[in-house]
Amino acid sequence: MATKIVIDAGHGGSVDPGAVYKGREEKNDNLNLAMAVGKILSENGVDVVYTRTDDTYQTPFEKAQIANEDGADFFLSFHRNSSPMPNQYSGVESLVYDLSGTKAELAKNINGALGELGFKDLGVSARPGLVVLRRTRMP
């Protein structure tokens, strides 16, 4: 049985564009990245489920429910940070519910692999208050 990953493109719809800079909206960047990563994973035998494939809004509770009801093995949510200070968030950061077990190890491995491709590793941080991390039953 193939590994199942739910991929969430953070933000979406007219109510939640995420970070915006000079007309560029985070929700669109997240969707493009989610679809590209999902395609690569699918081509390599992973069963991919998307929380959204178009510009729609879902609450974090709905996103967690999709992952839980689909019986996903892993949940991956893409976001992009922004700051008025140049290059403050230039790199990759992974957020997990806590720093134990598979979730933390997987996040470190993802950051490391992206680091090998030239991305700055901004680390792995515990964020137990985030609904999609608190409500999903998988790493």
Predicted regions and their residues:
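Short glycine-rich His-centered loop
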Residues: 2-23
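Active-site-proximal helix/loop segments of hydrolytic enzymes
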Residues: 2-4, 24, 28-139
